[in-house]
Amino acid sequence: MKSLLPLAILAALAVATLCYESHESMESYEISPFINRRNANTFMSPQQRWRAKAQKRVQERNKPAYEINREACDDYKLCERYAMVYGYNAAYNRYFRQRRGAKY
């Protein structure tokens, strides 16, 4: 009986400390966490946006041949189906490479 009382007090303290809710874990105190459309991209400077666009243009221009072939095949449904079975290289060769002696 003597050990039961301290054990109950210890359990109550453990529950109280574990269930304590600090103010740090509460949601933001801001009135509205969302911003309007005009201010949505103000965190990124115009120079950074320009640099990102330029980098994307360079990346689009310097694509490897296999990626260009794959994109061409993705736009044509029959080629895409053939590619699922035999691979994109075989599908591109079948549908887009000109055969010898063929007149187009």
UniProtKB/Swiss-Prot annotation:
Coarse class of the protein's main subcellular location: secreted
InterPro entries: GLA-like_dom_SF, GLA_domain, MGP, Osteocalcin/MGP
PTM-bearing positions, type Phosphoserine: 22, 25, 28
Keyword Disulfide bond in record: yes
PROSITE patterns cross-referenced by the UniProt entry: GLA_1, GLA_2
Keyword set includes Disulfide bond: yes
Domain of life assignment: Eukaryota
MF annotations from Gene Ontology: calcium ion binding
Keywords assigned: Chondrogenesis, Developmental protein, Differentiation, Disulfide bond, Gamma-carboxyglutamic acid, Osteogenesis, Phosphoprotein, Secreted, Signal
GO cellular component, one term: extracellular region
Cysteines engaged in disulfide bonds, as pairs: 73-79
Residues the record lists as 4-carboxyglutamate modifications: 21, 60, 67, 71
Secretion signal, residue range per the UniProt entry: 1-19
Subcellular locations according to the entry: Secreted
Modification comment: Requires vitamin K-dependent gamma-carboxylation for its function.
GO biological process, one term: cartilage development
Residue ranges annotated for the Gla domain, each copy included: 51-97
Protein role: Associates with the organic matrix of bone and cartilage. Thought to act as an inhibitor of bone formation.
Protein family membership: Belongs to the osteocalcin/matrix Gla protein family.
Name of the protein described by the UniProt record: Matrix Gla protein
Taxonomic source organism: Mus musculus
